Amino acid sequence: MEEENIYPIFDRMLSRKDKEELLGQRGVMLWLTGLSGSGKSTIAIALERELHKRGLLCRILDGDNIRSGINNNLGFSAEDRVENIRRIAEIGKLFVDTGIITIAAFISPGNELRQMAARIIGIEDFLEIYVSTPLVECEKRDVKGLYAKARRGEIKNFTGISAPFEAPEHPALSLDTSKLSLEESVNTLLELVLPIVGKKGEKI
């Protein structure tokens, strides 16, 4: 008996190129990494709005919409943290392969974690953006009161306080929001991203 292809649907689906031509843009992953309170989600939301104004389709993935949904069965053990990032990367790959500009905003504290995400998504489609705002500034902001709880020992293994954060070795871009305004951060990102994703209506 001939070996059956258990994934025959992949051979019949429209290609990534078909979808990118329909959208008039190239799919790419912008992976924002940095400490809690560094400005990742704020930048992601502002960038999405600017890209949307230009007729470009985007999707944000962050802790709120991932942990409350597909990853709501995961905790914060070492194993669960790896699985959290693995699932995010797999979801991100689906969006990127559909031609969507995907913006992921996650602490993702280890280089190995981010390298795993890059391998899943595809190195050529993965732009690592380091939101390098210093700990002292992030702790000063502490909008959710997490740093205060971590200092009191109420939160264990909190990145930057009781757990390490490994700065990216070769990020595509570094943004320190203690020195850059939100507008400056977004404009810097646009300068990086627009030439890569193409403009609506132009051949990509």
UniProtKB/Swiss-Prot annotation:
This is Adenylyl-sulfate kinase. Pathway: Sulfur metabolism; hydrogen sulfide biosynthesis; sulfite from sulfate: step 2/3. Gene3D superfamilies: P-loop containing nucleotide triphosphate hydrolases. ATP binds at residues 34-41. It comes from the Bacteria. It comes from Phocaeicola vulgatus (strain ATCC 8482 / DSM 1447 / JCM 5826 / CCUG 4940 / NBRC 14291 / NCTC 11154). PANTHER family: BIFUNCTIONAL 3'-PHOSPHOADENOSINE 5'-PHOSPHOSULFATE SYNTHASE (PTHR11055), PAPS SYNTHETASE, ISOFORM D (PTHR11055:SF1). Pfam families: APS_kinase.
